Amino acid sequence: MDGSFVQHSVRVLQELNKQREKGQYCDATLDVGGLVFKAHWSVLACCSHFFQSLYGDGSGGSVVLPAGFAEIFGLLLDFFYTGHLALTSGNRDQVLLAARELRVPEAVELCQSFKPKISVGQAAGGQSGQGPPASQNVNSHVKEPAGLEEEEVSRTLGLVPRDQEPRGSHSPQRPKLHSLAQSESPSSLCGKLKQASKPCPPEDKKLEDCKVLPRPFEAEGAQLQGGSNEWEVVVQVEDDGDGDYMSEPEAVLTRRKSNVIRKPCAAEPALNAGSLAAEPAENRKGTAVPVECPTCHKKFLSKYYLKVHNRKHTGEKPFECPKCGKCYFRKENLLEHEARNCMNRSEQVFTCSVCQETFRRRMELRVHMVSHTGEMPYKCSSCSQQFMQKKDLQSHMIKLHGAPKPHACPTCAKCFLSRTELQLHEAFKHRGEKLFVCEECGHRASSRNGLQMHIKAKHRNERPHVCEFCSHAFTQKANLNMHLRTHTGEKPFQCHLCGKTFRTQASLDKHNRTHTGERPFSCEFCEQRFTEKGPLLRHVASRHQEGRPHFCQICGKTFKAVEQLRVHVRRHKGVRKFECTECGYKFTRQAHLRRHMEIHDRVENYNPRQRKLRNLIIEDEKMVVVALQPPAELEVGSAEVIVESLAQGGLASQLPGQRLCAEESFTGPGVLEPSLIITAAVPEDCDT
């Protein structure tokens, strides 16, 4: 053992425990029934599979645990840091329950091997004075395999976790059920369980006085429905994940837990044999048939958990707090929120220490304090910018100073600001999933924001944000702000390597590929790769596709790529934002304007000849959509009249139903004046 210190690991754990007791370097906050515990995420993740799955990457945060764990959670936390678990006959059941639901296998093993002072015979005799001991019913006839029946009943009663508990374990507070479950059929089993159960005390005794362990994460279906006097006992730990989500092997091997029906009474409820016998045979005997999410193909034990999971795809939060208006995916999350004294928090006020002014929110007080101090809490270390929130400072450091984004994709190494953006990127880019589906037309979007934009633009025709310079309308204000930069010349995104600035983050990302040499877009027909998607589409259209299949339905010009057609149609909409300062000639692309300016430099008094149909502007939005459709989809109507008339070269006499600008005239069939405007009426039954 040269060069090693045997007690090093013990000393490190002791120091961590001292830090926990002093609250030093603790990055985890655990709220258990109003009691707050500080701990280290690394220690929690090492000892509990629950915490490891909840925050697998070790990021900080706070977790709210069931109030029923308040009395014994301190014992488990001490066990995490010291390895010692203070068990007694009084707290053994609660510690075992918490250890199972938090998935602490070492604590579960200690609880199962714990020997209480009260014998099993005395405990069984105190609970019921009737019937023979459960161990005597070994030779009874069996209708199903004993091990499977034992697993179902024990798991439903909260005695065994999903992976079957060792048979030697028992609880001093409850009747022993293992051999009973092995030897009896479902109907006779329920009868003996009723005999072994503790009888109900008088009705004036409160339910809180009974030894009924609380179920912190009960499913919504476990609540009373329509005044019924029965409910389903669902014993299941449900974290922030997808409830009863099962992996592929587990979906095959796991059996459905028994649907034991319980009747409410003032004490420990007894099992109802009649209700159990009335169940369908497939629920009592058959194996569980997992239900699958049609969007992401995850599997669940029940339709309820699938219903809750689907809300993540739709964004629905049906459970709203009546006091503060906060919404949740699941009802149990709302109940936990209400249990944390929502009303008391909403009535809390924050007072300024300087002028004694009161505020309802802490953020409002922070904003107010800036008027006294003149300084915001978060300052940029590279420039003089200040921010009220940490996330704003983080975004500023990434956009302007080249700080790395915290969440990297393990497949392509692309980084994101939030974990949600990373998950959506992996689903869309690497698995080809578009998880958000429009209920009206079936359109699929890769993000919830994209789906909302689709609904507003296509089904609601909502474009409330209008540009004050060119009257172009947008569905979102962020898109308008991005568009305004084309008029103001603002370029807030700067490359931290060469200092070049850009209008959008996407443009900066494309530019960064010139430094890194990355070419993420590859051609499926050859080995050529590209830095952008547009050049890839043009390459495929020009090199690997024959003919020019895409043509404009207004002027008849043909194109190889549909992107080229879309750019061309903008000319018919009048979108020419690059204007020559010498002659006023306008272009759709800046490269065309630069090429035109070179002609002015070489030729004096250059006056470009107006090309036919160059400035034909269609005011009707539907006509632009018609222009992008293939000819087979067009119906006989004014749109075809326009195309035919343009081909013949005489517009005024052929379009009696159209409106021509009064100031325009034709000098000949080969030349068209610059500002001919057509407002077309598309038939209502045209599918646009």
From Swiss-Prot:
Subunit relationships: Interacts with EP300.
Domain comment, as recorded: The C2H2-type zinc fingers mediate binding to the telomeric double-stranded 5'-TTAGGG-3' repeats. The last C2H2-type zinc finger is required for telomeric-binding. The two last C2H2-type zinc fingers are required for CIITA promoter III binding.
Name of the encoding gene: ZBTB48
Protein keywords: Activator, Chromosome, DNA-binding, Isopeptide bond, Metal-binding, Nucleus, Phosphoprotein, Repeat, Telomere, Transcription, Transcription regulation, Ubl conjugation, Zinc, Zinc-finger
Protein name: Zinc finger and BTB domain-containing protein 48
Endpoints of the signal sequence: none
Pfam families registered for this protein in UniProt: BTB (PF00651), zf-C2H2 (PF00096)
Role according to the record: Plays a critical role in transcriptional regulation and chromatin remodeling. Acts as a regulator of telomere length. Directly binds the telomeric double-stranded 5'-TTAGGG-3' repeat. Preferentially binds to telomeres that have a low concentration of shelterin complex and acts as a regulator of telomere length by initiating telomere trimming, a process that prevents the accumulation of aberrantly long telomeres. Also acts as a transcription regulator that binds to promoter regions. Regulates expression of a small subset of genes, including MTFP1.
One GO term describing the cellular component: nucleoplasm
InterPro entries (UniProt xref): BTB/POZ_dom, SKP1/BTB/POZ_sf, Znf_C2H2_sf, Znf_C2H2_type
Molecular function per GO: DNA-binding transcription repressor activity, RNA polymerase II-specific; double-stranded telomeric DNA binding; RNA polymerase II cis-regulatory region sequence-specific DNA binding; transcription cis-regulatory region binding; zinc ion binding
PROSITE patterns in the record: BTB, ZINC_FINGER_C2H2_1, ZINC_FINGER_C2H2_2
PANTHER family linked to this entry: GASTRULA ZINC FINGER PROTEIN XLCGF26.1-LIKE-RELATED, ZINC FINGER AND BTB DOMAIN-CONTAINING
Organism of origin: Pongo abelii (Sumatran orangutan)
Domain of life from the UniProt record: Eukaryota
Segments for region (Disordered): 159-205
Residues holding Zn(2+) 3: 352, 355, 368, 372
The BTB domain, residue ranges: 26-89
Residues noted as binding Zn(2+) 1 in the record, renumbered to the chain: 293, 296, 309, 313
Covalent cross-link (Glycyl lysine isopeptide (Lys-Gly) (interchain with G-Cter in SUMO2)), residues: 143, 263
Zinc finger regions, C2H2-type: 291-313, 350-372, 378-401, 407-430, 436-459, 465-487, 493-515, 521-544, 550-572, 578-600
Locations listed in the record: Nucleus; Chromosome, Telomere
Residues that coordinate or bind Zn(2+) 2: 321, 324, 337, 342
